[in-house]
Amino acid sequence: FTYAVGKLVLWSSDANLVKNDVAAVLNSANVKHVAIANPKLAPYGEAAYQTLKSLGLEKAVEGKTVLGDNIGKTYQFVKTGNAEAGFIALSQCFKDGKFVSGSGYVIPQDLYSEIKQDAVLLKKGENNEGAKRFLKFLKESKEATAIRDAYGYGTAK
């Protein structure tokens, strides 16, 4: 079952770079590198490219793109300043309902395919009461929903 939905954000470690205009950031002379996870390997990378296409901004990142093998490496490119901005998971830079550092813009979820976070109970664990309780917690608990929201995830529809 899907217990959460990932959210994409255009983020920068520079607290003043990202406002609410993706095009302005990507076309800025100050942005020489834009980090994106490899879309062949990472759902957030695919979502980033879908967003660029939806907004007609594919050309804005030509020659500026730095591909990360995964979303963790992509975050590191931006966090360390090796890329001025990047498309990362909101959960990487968000805590208690706000950005931990830097600046970001949460990409509207209608611009990319849903990034589902799924949980399963393996056959080996079907008799494990702790595992069953944890899955029930993820599915039914208001506390679990509050935790997901606080750390930048959406709730599955």
Where does each model-flagged region fall?
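Exported/periplasmic ABC-transporter solute-binding proteins
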Residues: 1-157
